[in-house]
Swiss-Prot record:
This is Leucine--tRNA ligase. Belongs to the class-I aminoacyl-tRNA synthetase family. A motif ('KMSKS' region) lies at residues 575-579. One of its GO terms (molecular function) is ATP binding. It is found in: Cytoplasm. One of its GO terms (cellular component) is cytosol. Its EC number is 6.1.1.4. One of its GO terms (biological process) is leucyl-tRNA aminoacylation.
């Protein structure tokens, strides 16, 4: 009989739902395993075939671990705040909450159609007030500890959108969405002091088993570097420009100073003669985002302020310039330029005719920048020293002369935590008329987002919440008037702690019970896309460390193992996108081929961490394999749906003993190490051998069903029932292997004549030389060749070969 995937999949999905098959067990006698997917943003497009790749991998692990006797926590939820829902609401006049709920319903239907073993009793949604009550609570704790603060920050302001956009959303001075002009504008923003955790965020990467590439990206993003901070006095002003440098050895090569255009000293030190040029330059760059400004490939621009600084090591006058390649937010907002030995400084100096002063031997800076190592030259008391020795001598000199000190600097900036948007968590802060600020009292949390479909930009730069005056204005018991914070939190907020709420999702009194957190943390396996390597994974580690410091969580790190699945590309090898028309909808695949086929195919495409193109042919191949499995187990020439093949017998003639035990060992190890494609290859080897065997022992038939169940759960549940079992396969014991069965009793030996291969034969292991020699001579292909020749010599090596020398 043919396999009807639609009927079987519907049957077992209904069974799992009605029996709550995947409800998390919390048996104290069992070990715990927490398998976590990065929860999705429920977009209007629904699921695409890229989502199930990571979800299938965690599901395989979760299903295997249940069968191995673990308590398994395998939850799913929704990262549901965010810009697309708000944009949709602006465009259509509909409520983003309704739109979001509709999308969640679609996602949930699609996810369930793929047979994932989630415990839906633990579902979380970042837009649910019962959830974001605790997001707000964490913010308040950070505020109390001085880690949440307000600052005037230069942001990318889009008057047309009526909001601030992130650096990543600005392209050539315009917004990515809609192409509206962007201006740099200082605005009051909430910041989180992630820099206070910079060292721990680097050092504690040693505690986790993550891909080295992700660890490196985080280390580089934090950008810890050791150097010196040097003070340059401004000529004719009572002011100093502080500069951080990792190359204190090149102090004698400084030929000018460059400040960020936003540096606080620019207005004070610019001379009347240069004011027009400086003002024109400031106007020119106001559309540029930080990303564009620091693009190494772009042409260097700048303006001379007319002022000079004094080099503290030799008293030389250094012209002070401004240029947009220096950012006010990085380091001190000013750099000392050593154009002979730094590519950006060299380009700038060449463009504006500034002097080049070589201080490292070798190279010709007039022709090209010289960055190779050498010894110090033109550097007074540093001459003849190598780089490190010169740094080690210069820093104490700077300290002694009170013009500098040793300093550790970080590329990491504090986290800009506010958005001028409606569809986000309200920040639980009240600004009072007397100039003070307070948090919303804890017993009044959550501070709920007022539901409205009238979401339009305020026009002032504030979020649309500024329009909702009933919500906005408050009065305390003493009659003091106040105004709620109108900024909302960024989409990163809820995702920075959601994995904790899954552990205790209904707790009204705590973010989560500490003993439960102790039972389940750290997360054993976290799977998601590599695009989150820095932002999400850095933010979540920062929040976790803060919660550890205040005694809310028991571990220093949230996730023990991290795995980044690759990307599924369109069949034209490009990223799937609606605009390219190459998006594959999983609903279509499930309808035509079945969920088990989709799961099997996505795990068999290649290594889980590789980016691979979608192939209809590969999908058909996966279905073909499942059909072969089905035919092996079922009686073909009957219409009855539960007729087991007569090939499946109680007796075991050991024909499949070795390959079965090899398969159990290999599949178990490959599942553990996420090598699912290799595991599937071994399952295919077993099925091929089972077809060739005379009978299929029930013991192995049942064992194989257990091995394939985590990948193809619907078909395997059906076969398990056909094998006579009343209960679901979800909690039956995982197969074990017999190590003795892996030892080969037979080996392949080759027979040669005069070094040329004549035959390959299978013989008993450790067959003695004399017997091997006799077998070789008796072999018809060998005998035919030596019939009319004299055998001069026979070389027999047990378990390997027999070579007969004859002429």
């Amino acid at each position: 009989m043919t396999y009807d995937h639609r009927a079987v999949e519907q049957k077992w999905q209904a069974y799992w739902q009605s029996h709550k098959s995947f409800k998390t067990t919390e048996d104290k006698d069992k070990k715990n395993f927490y398998a976590l997917d990065m929860f999705p943003y429920p977009s209007g497009q629904g699921l695409h075939v890229g989502h199930p790749e990571g979800y299938t991998a965690t599901d395989i692990l979760a299903r295997m671990k249940r069968m191995q006797g673990f308590n398994v926590l395998h939850p799913m939820g929704w990262d549901a705040f965010g810009l697309p829902a708000e944009q949709y609401a602006l465009d259509t006049g509909n409520n983003p909450a309704d739109f979001t709920q509709k999308n969640i319903n679609t996602f949930k239907r699609q996810i369930n159609s793929l047979g994932f073993s989630y415990d839906w009793d633990r579902e979380v949604n970042t837009t649910d007030p019962d959830f974001y009550k605790w997001t707000q609570w964490i913010f308040e704790k950070m505020y109390e500890k001085g880690l949440a603060y307000e600052a005037e920050v230069a942001v990318n302001w889009s008057p047309d959108l009526g909001t601030v956009v992130a650096n990543e959303e600005v392209i050539d001075g315009k917004t990515e969405r809609g192409g509206y002009p962007v201006y740099r504008k200082p605005m009051r923003q909430w910041m989180l002091k992630i820099t206070a955790y910079a060292d721990r965020l680097i050092d504690d990467l040693d505690l986790v088993d993550w891909p080295e590439s992700v660890k490196d990206m985080q280390r580089n993003w934090i950008g810890r570097s050791k150097g010196a901070e040097v003070s340059f006095a401004v000529e004719n002003h009572d002011a100093n420009i502080d500069v951080f440098t990792t190359r204190a050895d090149t102090m004698f090569g400084v030929s000018y100073i460059v400040m960020a255009p936003e540096h606080k000293l620019v207005a004070d030190i610019t001379t009347p003669e240069q004011k027009a040029a400086v003002d024109a330059y400031l106007k020119e760059i106001e559309h540029k985002s930080d990303l564009e400004r620091t693009d190494l490939a772009k042409d260097k621009t700048g303006a001379f302020t007319g002022a000079y600084a004094i080099n503290p090591v030799n008293g030389e006058r250094l012209p002070i310039w401004i240029s947009d390649y220096v950012l006010a937010s990085y380091g001190t907002g000013a750099v000392m330029a050593v154009p002979a030995h730094d590519p950006r400084d060299w380009e700038f100096a060449k463009k504006f005719g500034l002097p080049l002063k070589p201080v490292v031997s070798g190279g010709n800076p007039e022709e090209a920048v010289h960055t190779e190592p050498g010894v110090m030259i033109n550097s007074d008391f540093l001459d003849g020293l190598d780089k490190q020795a010169a740094i080690d001598k210069m820093i104490p000199w700077l300290v002694e002369h009170k013009v500098g000190h040793e300093q550790i600097s970080y590329k990491l900036r504090d986290w800009l935590f506010s958005r001028q948007r409606y569809w986000g968590e309200p920040i639980p802060i009240i600004h009072w008329e007397d100039g003070t600020t307070s948090v919303v009292p804890e017993d009044q949390l959550p501070l709920e987002l007022p539901l409205t479909s009238d979401i339009k930009p305020s026009g002032t730069g504030e979020s649309p919440l500024a329009n909702l005056t009933d919500w906005l204005n408050v009065t305390d018991e003493n009659g003091r008037k106040g105004r709620r914070e109108t900024n909302t939190m960024p989409q990163w907020a809820g995702s920075s702690w959601y994995y904790l709420r899954y552990i205790d999702p209904k707790n009204p009194d705590k973010l989560a019970d500490f003993d439960k957190l102790k039972d389940w943390l750290p997360v054993d396996m976290y799977i998601g896309g590599a695009e989150h390597a820095v932002l999400h994974l850095l933010y979540v580690r920062f929040w976790h460390k803060f919660l550890y410091d205040i005694g809310v969580v028991p571990t220093k790190e949230p996730f023990q193992h991290l795995y980044n699945q690759g990307m599924i590309l369109g069949d034209n090898h490009e990223k799937m996108s609606k605009s390219k028309g190459n998006v594959v909808n999983p609903d279509d695949v499930v309808d035509r081929f079945g969920a088990d086929t989709l799961r099997l195919y996505e795990m068999f495409m290649g290594p889980l961490d590789a980016s691979i193109s979608w192939s209809e042919k590969g999908l058909a191949g996966a279905r073909k394999f499942l059909d072969r499995v089905w035919r092996l187990y079922t009686e073909e020439d009957t219409d009855e749906n539960d007729q087991l093949s007569s090939k499946i017998v109680a007796d075991n003639n050991d024909q499949l003993k070795k390959v079965y035990n090899e398969t159990v060992k290999k599949v178990t190890e490959d599942f553990e190490s996420m090598h699912f494609n290799v595991a599937i290859s071994q399952l295919m080897v077993f099925i091929n051998d089972a077809y060739k065997a005379d009978t299929f022992p029930r013991e192995y038939a049942e064992g194989f069903v257990k091995l394939l169940a985590p990948i193809a759960p619907h078909m395997m549940e059906e076969l398990w029932a056909m094998l006579g079992h009343d209960d679901s396969i979800s909690y039956v014991d995982w197969p074990t292997f017999d190590p003795a069965a892996l030892i080969a009793n037979e080996v392949e030996v080759i027979f040669q004549v005069n070094g040329k291969l004549k035959a390959k034969v299978t013989v008993a292991k450790d067959t003695p030389k004399e017997e091997l020699e006799a077998m070789a001579k008796a072999n018809e292909k060998v005998a035919e060749f030596i019939a009319d020749k004299t055998v001069r010599k026979v070389i027999a090596i047990p378990n390997k070969l027999v070579n007969i020398v004859a002429n």
